[in-house]
């Protein structure tokens, strides 16, 4: 049952996800493609985590955070992709009220953690390249754990705002979400209550996270670039660039899509464009991250060669 009578209001108990397309042939094609992407995402990120665990040369703060970033990538993709894949095969794609709230909260939670982790990793590279003599002190095991816990706490607080907003919304019908998952904007459009204060609070929280993390990343990489340009050793420059380019590529991909979804005015793009960008953000980027790090980071490539016992893999 999609609706229940509650006094003078009709309360929504489930939502219909309209998904990416109604074309049956295209749905099958997308099912195959996205399922393959999800399998590559899980296997690639699990491989990254395992490689970091078993390779002693990767037991450094940067790779400690990278292993957690890989875990978050699996979590972000898993919060949406399995349900989306199943919905390609059914005629009526429905999700319960509770399930919708959990999906929204988990997507926001893991997305915020990823932003914090990328900022922490940028700070780690800043200390390693600009203050190498203080690296062991500034990035001690205790400091790394504190930064990690802080990232999770920040993600939890951010997700709490969105979850509180969701349970405060009054849904009277219709219950058709024009998206492939329970995203915040389509839910706001379906709500029949006054949500202006909650929307401002959620927007402020999102904006704060984006501004703070982008500021940390920008300042860190500006200082890194200045330091690298001052290096006289070509080998030193190459090593510094090697450890930074992979992370900077991931940052560019993530914040490019986040800017499109959350910063650009909604009137500047259509709902279908938003869906495509959301697929890239929640499905494709988690798959690309381990590939980027394995191809562009010499330490990752070296550890992989050592574990596989091969010398000419790359």
From Swiss-Prot:
Indicate which residues are glycosylated according to the record. Answer: 8
Q: Tell me the residue ranges located in the Extracellular compartment per UniProt.
A: 1-28, 79-102, 158-199, 262-274
> What InterPro entries is this protein classified in?
GPCR_Rhodpsn, GPCR_Rhodpsn_7TM, Olfact_rcpt
Q: What does the record say about its membrane topology? A: Multi-pass membrane protein
Q: Which residues lie on this side of the membrane: Cytoplasmic?
A: 50-57, 124-136, 221-240, 296-314
GO MF term list: G protein-coupled receptor activity; olfactory receptor activity
Q: Which UniProt keywords apply?
A: Cell membrane, Disulfide bond, G-protein coupled receptor, Glycoprotein, Membrane, Olfaction, Receptor, Sensory transduction, Transducer, Transmembrane, Transmembrane helix
What is one process in the GO biological process aspect for this record? G protein-coupled receptor signaling pathway
Record's Gene Ontology CC terms? membrane; plasma membrane
The UniProt entry, under Pfam families, shows:
7tm_4
Span-the-membrane segments of this chain are 29-49, 58-78, 103-123, 137-157, 200-220, 241-261, 275-295
Q: List the disulfide bonds.
A: 100-192
Source domain of life: Eukaryota
Record keyword Transmembrane present: yes
Localisation per UniProt entry: Cell membrane
Tell me its family. Belongs to the G-protein coupled receptor 1 family.
List the PANTHER family hit by this protein, alphabetically. OLFACTORY RECEPTOR
Task of the protein? Potential odorant receptor.
Protein name (Swiss-Prot/TrEMBL): Olfactory receptor 5P81
Instruction: Give the organism, scientific name.
Output: Mus musculus
> What gene name is given for the protein in this entry?
Or5p81
